[in-house]
Regions:
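Cell-wall glycan-active module
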Residues: 1-226, 236-305
Length: 305
């Protein structure tokens, strides 16, 4: 197939998806339609778009995403976001000698910025520096996944075929006996439904950010969970906690001043206090993992010694 022909196919496919969206009301009732689709609606992006609009995501924003060549469907986002609980992440590398040295260097280099954030939000520089290391190695690893595509893909998590494949994956990962497949499938179905609703909320948040014009959400790159920037905020976290650290009127989480102030603001809003219990609870709110909390707290302590 020539390059011209390939582009023609892509353009025609996108047009068909948008045309199928045009027939949808802005906020139609979602119901629970998991039946196989045909025609234009058989395209995964078309199904994802319809599911998003039916859950209240702005139709014009979805159409804008579909017209962008970066937007795509990828089953790996359905798989990873629904089944990630089956494998336990290892955070131990986050307090090795390289990590400690890097955080100490960061604390020295950005002392004034960190203390400014601390003076407003009461979050120690060592905690901010440690958290940013655990999240993105101080901006070295922010993720290459197209954020809108992550959430569009997750919108299809509760389709039967994906529930079945994810059920088998979880059973294998956790060595679950085949006799328990029905209970695992039921659990995965409920989890998939929650993930679909979660993805819709994140798409709504992306639209709100786009309206604010503080970041261009169409080109956002981040993690497999759609978290982005040095802080690895979800779009909803951006709306609630992102802060302008340099007074330029924008909030760019790939910019260090904004990232530092946003982490401090997030933890402050999450109840950061003087007791270890309050501090651990605030970090746990940032990432719902005891091992994550331990990694941040341990790295902060080791870097300050």
């Amino acid at each position: 197939m020539s390059m011209f022909s390939l582009f023609s196919v892509i353009a025609a496919s996108t047009a068909a998806i948008i045309l199928s969206l045009a027939s949808l009301p802005q906020n139609s009732s979602s119901g629970d339609d998991r039946s196989p689709k045909t025609g234009a609606d058989s395209h995964p992006l078309a199904r994802a778009a319809s599911a998003a609009v039916s859950r209240g995501v702005d139709k014009n924003y979805i159409e804008l995403l579909l017209q962008d060549s970066m937007s795509s469907f990828d089953e790996k986002y359905v798989r990873t976001n629904v089944t990630n609980f089956a494998t336990k992440p290892d955070y131990s590398h986050n307090w090795n000698s390289e990590a400690v040295a890097s955080v100490r260097e960061f604390l020295t280099k950005h002392e004034n910025l960190l203390h400014r954030a601390d003076s407003i939000h009461g979050v120690p520089p060592s905690i901010i520096a440690a958290l940013l290391w655990v999240e993105t190695k101080h901006g070295r690893v922010t993720g290459k996944h197209h954020v809108p595509s992550v959430y569009l893909s997750v919108m299809l998590s509760n389709e039967p075929a994906f529930i079945e494949s994810n059920t088998l994956l979880v059973m294998k990962a956790k060595s679950i006996d085949s006799s328990k497949i029905d209970s695992v499938r039921e659990s995965l179905t409920k989890r998939a439904d929650r993930k679909v609703n979660w993805a819709a909320q994140q798409l709504k948040a992306l639209h709100a950010i786009q309206v604010r014009k503080t970041m261009n959400t169409l080109t956002l790159r981040g993690s497999w969970a759609g978290a982005f920037g040095l802080t690895q905020f979800l779009p909803s976290s951006y709306l609630s906690s992102a802060a302008d650290g340099n007074g330029d009127g924008l909030i760019d989480l790939y910019q260090l001043d904004d990232a530092v102030f946003s982490v401090a603001n997030y933890l402050d809003r999450a109840g950061w206090g003087k007791t270890p219990e309050q501090q651990r609870k605030a970090i746990h709110h940032y990432n719902n993992s005891d091992d994550y909390v331990e990694a941040v707290m341990r790295l902060a302590k080791m870097s300050g010694e």
